[in-house]
C-alpha cells in the first residue's frame, strides 16, 4: 500500500532554537523551523541563487529549476524553512517519491533497491543557508529534521548525493547517519557521492576492515565501494582531508 505523504507528514512540525553567530560575530537571535507553503517559493529560490553565487567552483551545488522547487511544495515532497524573525534564512527539501513516475532524482535505482521500496523512499535533495547565518549548524539540523519527518511517515530508505569537493555537505550527512555507498554523475559531468541509510537499522561496520583514503583518490574509493565498503567518517591527517571506509558485518 502506498503512503499519502500529503496527509501523513505532520504539518504542525515546529522546532525552535537560538542562533549564536551572524556574519561571524556573536549574537543571540531566536529561530523557528516549520514546513513551508508554496508562497515561500521566491524566497527559497533567492537563497538557492545566493548559494550558487558563492560556491568556490562550478558544479559543487546543482542548479535547480523553479519547477523543481514548486514540485516539492505541492507534489512529491515538502520543504522545511528556518526563520529569524519573519525572514526565511534557510531551507531543506525532503523528496517523497510516489513511485517510478517521479521526475527528479531516482536514488532508489542508483542504489539497486527493489521497485517495491518506492513508497519507502525519502530523498534529501536540497539545502541552503543564507551566508550571514552560516556557522549555526542549520545545515545539519535540517538534515536531522528531515530524517525525523521521513521516520514519521515510514519512509525508511533515505538517500542523498553530495559533491566530493563539498565536505561541509557530506560531513553533515555522515554525521546524521547516512553512509557513502556509491558514486554517480549528475547531468553527465558533476561527480557525486551517493549516500544512504535505512532508518530501520543497518549492519555495524567491521573495525578490522577500516581503510582511510584521501578524498581526492576517487579511483581507490570506487574500488572500495565496488568491493562492498561504506564510507562512514571524515578524518584530517597531515592537513589532508580523508574518508574512512569499512565493510559492513554480516547481518
Tell where the protein language model's regions lie, with residue ranges.
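Intrinsically disordered, low-complexity, positively biased terminal segments
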Residues: 1-25, 174, 180-251
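Short amphipathic alpha-helix that is part of the acyltransferase structural core
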Residues: 12-67, 73-84, 88-89, 206-214
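Short hydrophobic/aromatic beta-strand element in the GNAT-like acyltransferase core
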Residues: 77-81, 91-93, 126, 192, ...
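Conserved acyl-donor/pantetheine-binding loop and adjacent beta-alpha core of acyl/acetyltransferases
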Residues: 89-126
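Conserved GNAT acetyl-CoA-binding A-motif
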Residues: 150-164, 190-191
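Conserved active-site alpha-helix within GNAT-family acetyltransferase domains
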Residues: 152-154, 164-184
Amino acid at each position: 500500500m502506498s503512503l499519502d505523504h500529503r496527509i501523513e507528514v505532520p504539518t504542525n512540525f515546529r522546532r525552535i532554537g537560538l542562533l549564536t553567530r551572524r556574519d561571524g560575530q556573536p549574537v543571540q537571535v531566536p529561530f523557528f523551523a516549520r514546513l513551508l507553503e508554496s508562497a515561500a517559493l521566491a524566497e527559497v529560490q533567492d537563497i538557492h541563487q545566493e548559494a550558487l553565487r558563492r560556491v568556490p567552483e562550478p558544479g559543487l551545488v546543482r542548479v535547480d529549476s523553479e519547477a523543481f522547487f514548486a514540485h516539492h511544495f505541492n507534489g512529491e515532497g515538502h520543504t522545511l524553512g528556518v526563520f529569524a524573525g519573519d525572514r526565511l534564512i534557510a531551507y531543506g527539501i525532503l523528496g517523497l517519491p510516489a513511485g517510478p513516475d517521479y521526475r527528479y532524482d531516482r536514488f532508489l535505482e542508483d542504489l539497486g533497491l527493489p521497485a517495491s521500496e518506492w513508497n519507502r523512499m525519502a530523498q534529501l535533495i536540497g539545502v541552503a543557508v543564507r551566508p550571514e547565518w552560516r556557522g549555526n549548524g542549520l545545515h545539519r539540523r535540517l538534515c536531522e529534521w528531515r530524517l525525523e519527518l521521513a521516520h514519521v511517515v515510514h519512509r525508511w530508505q533515505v538517500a542523498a548525493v553530495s559533491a566530493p569537493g563539498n565536505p561541509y555537505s557530506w560531513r553533515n550527512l555522515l554525521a546524521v547517519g547516512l553512509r557513502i555507498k556509491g558514486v554517480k554523475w549528475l547531468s553527465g559531468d558533476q561527480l557525486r557521492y551517493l549516500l544512504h541509510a535505512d532508518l530501520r537499522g543497518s549492519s555495524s561496520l567491521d573495525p578490522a576492515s577500516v581503510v582511510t583514503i584521501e578524498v581526492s583518490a576517487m579511483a581507490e574509493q570506487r574500488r572500495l565501494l565496488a568491493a562492498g565498503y561504506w564510507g562512514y567518517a571524515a578524518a584530517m591527517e597531515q592537513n589532508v582531508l580523508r574518508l574512512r571506509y569499512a565493510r559492513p558485518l554480516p547481518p
